[in-house]
């Protein structure tokens, strides 16, 4: 068994080093001097430091979601934000609600949606079930994603999966043998004690915000022991452990990972990997302080260089396949861990997205270049045309959103940040086709209803399909190529 684990470790390290080389080559490039420095680091340091460095850096993409989730959980529950209207802040098992659609005034990046308004909550299910309740949503699209510490999705409550009628849904901890109240449906059994609950609620336009806010106020989280009691009786605790401070301890992030792993232990099929990492005292209930000095030095370097590697990878490896110039998010987004794709899970799904949308709820496509591979620029005139009968196959709606290269929305004279099938006054041609015009200058009054304003600068586009039909998320339907006249 130990022999197999050692070979597994060698292969794991080798694959990660190849990935590191790929990312490094895509960003900084190579030189003889850099190769010599790398070689000297390998040959002059004690073997314990080399081993800890290689294994620690190689394992970081797998372990990163645990660290990142713990950081975000603390921030969103215990750090008072500068702008409470756009930054989450709420007690445990309570919702925070955004109260406005994101526009160009928000400069936090991350390609924010201008179609839906967000609600978030950190759900703790260590002792008893917690019940999610929502009102009748009418014909409005909505979704609640229960996100694990790994950034994979445990379960979803949505207009697509559970229906638009009012409902109650219980997140149940492992080992619970009690009964749920009448009318409460059990979701998949929780695999850990903490979940990020992210809700997306469709907003037609600014005039629709009042109706959405009324719905949001009826999104409730109730621990089973408080079921039937007034909401004001619910505890508003923010008590949890704080991630270790890297300014005080070079091994702080590894200690945060160990504590997070103790709360949400890895799956049984990951035991071989955890047995390997146990050599470095990484894992549930492990103590890095008892590690030898050289291994500690290796882990400290591994965290520093590993985070740099992941930052470079996040910027240069968007993930997904490219068809007609559009790069789509991975088909198995939300379950990358179960698929064994830990690198993409750590770099893209967790580090870049926090809480992904599963394929049956939302499918995203992005691009920043034209059909010739040249960067998109507002001085050019682009058209996206859907032929008659070939509009996006969705059960909910679709949209096209424009972002600056800083991944923020871009201000414009008509305050239009996205365009789609909910946009008022879209004009179809006589043959039934629909063309969207993307450029800096107005395409003319007769085409302005179909105009998505662009800056006089480089930009990127994101196409979103909410409630996609199988032909879309399975790849039979693809977003048309962008033309440049």
Residue ranges with predicted function:
Residues 1-24:
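N-terminal Sec-pathway targeting helices
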């Amino acid at each position: 068994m130990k022999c197999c684990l050692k070979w597994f470790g060698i292969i794991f390290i080798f694959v990660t080093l190849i990935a590191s080389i790929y990312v490094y080559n895509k960003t900084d490039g190579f030189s003889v001097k850099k190769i010599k420095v790398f070689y000297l680091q390998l040959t002059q340091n004690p073997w314990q430091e080399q081993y800890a460095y290689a294994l620690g850096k190689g394992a970081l993409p797998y372990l990163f979601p645990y660290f990142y989730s713990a950081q975000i959980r603390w921030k969103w529950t215990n750090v008072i934000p500068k702008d409470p209207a756009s930054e989450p802040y709420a007690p445990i098992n309570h919702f925070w609600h955004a109260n406005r659609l994101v526009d160009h005034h928000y400069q936090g990046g991350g390609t924010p949606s201008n179609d839906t308004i967000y609600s978030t909550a950190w759900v703790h299910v260590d002792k008893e079930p917690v019940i999610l309740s929502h009102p009748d949503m009418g014909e409005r699209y909505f979704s609640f994603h229960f996100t694990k510490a790994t950034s994979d999705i445990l379960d979803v409550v949505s207009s697509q999966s559970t229906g638009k009628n009012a409902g109650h849904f219980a997140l149940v901890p492992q080992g619970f043998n009690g009964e749920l109240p009448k009318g409460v449906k059990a979701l998949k059994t929780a695999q850990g004690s903490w979940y990020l609950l992210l809700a997306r609620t469709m907003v037609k336009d600014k005039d629709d915000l009042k109706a959405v806010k009324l719905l949001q106020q009826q999104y409730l989280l109730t621990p089973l022991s408080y079921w039937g009691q007034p909401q004001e009786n619910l505890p508003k605790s923010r008590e949890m452990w704080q991630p270790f401070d890297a300014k005080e301890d070079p091994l702080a992030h590894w200690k945060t990972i160990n504590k997070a792993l103790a709360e949400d232990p890895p799956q049984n099929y990951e035991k071989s990997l955890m047995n390997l990492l146990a050599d470095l005292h990484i894992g549930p209930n492990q103590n890095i302080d008892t590690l030898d000095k050289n291994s500690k030095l290796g882990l400290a370097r591994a965290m520093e260089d590993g985070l740099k590697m992941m930052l470079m990878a996040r910027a240069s490896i968007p993930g997904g396949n490219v068809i007609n110039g559009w790069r789509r998010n991975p088909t198995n987004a939300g379950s990358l861990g179960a698929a064994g794709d830990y690198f993409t899970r750590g770099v893209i799904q967790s580090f870049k997205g926090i809480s992904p949308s599963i394929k049956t709820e939302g499918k995203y496509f992005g691009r920043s270049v034209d059909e010739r591979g040249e960067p998109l620029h507002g001085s050019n005139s682009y058209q996206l045309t859907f032929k008659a009968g070939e509009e996006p196959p969705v059960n909910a709606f679709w949209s096209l959103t424009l972002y600056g290269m800083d991944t923020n929305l871009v201000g414009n004279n008509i305050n239009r940040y996205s365009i789609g099938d909910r946009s008022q006054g879209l004009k179809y041609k006589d043959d039934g086709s629909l063309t969207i015009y993307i450029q800096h200058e107005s395409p003319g009054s007769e085409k302005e209803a179909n105009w998505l304003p662009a800056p006089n600068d480089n930009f990127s586009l994101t196409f979103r399909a909410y409630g996609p039909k199988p032909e879309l998320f399975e790849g039979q339907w693809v977003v048309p190529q962008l033309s440049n006249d």
